[in-house]
């Protein structure tokens, strides 16, 4: 499959990009373009953000600021982001296909698509993450995943709050370069537990009831069992619903044990 469009536009600013985007409902933003290419849809105008100054990783005292056009490989290897939560966030992102793919795929495109197989979303969801959309909208990553419909704006920046804590990431896959059969991220930050499960095969979500059990009682077995009950799981051609549930109980328990040490 290939990207099909009548026009190609490379703006120098977000203002230019947004103006072009609003001209026609069939105009589309292209970041890395890898998933768009697989979809094989017809677009009127593809708007390439590669020259809109959105490729950066910066930090201040409290936050890490990541431009939406930063590649997954850059996020994985940056001295700023590679050390977050002991390097576990970068490890989760390093599990996306192979290095050649991560040199093209962007952090913004990976989030904006809300892909059900995303290792990126699962890795970031348990953190305090804010998304900045041009021209004027902000929301947490969880709010965006639950947002109905399409956000009126362009994803500009991902802001990650710096916090002390521990993390555990696990991707279950058939071969090294496969999409996940299911993936997990367990984080303990500010003495609170956060559990994300993705590729069920739906976009990652937080297991709020399991988190509540851990935060109130610290009962790991009960929390792991609750995660299998509160989340929805489905069959797919290479893994059953029941096996996904079994894996969830095992790896949520292991994750909670790891971050509790």
Task: Spell out what each predicted region is.
Residues 1-261:
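C-terminal structural segment of proteins
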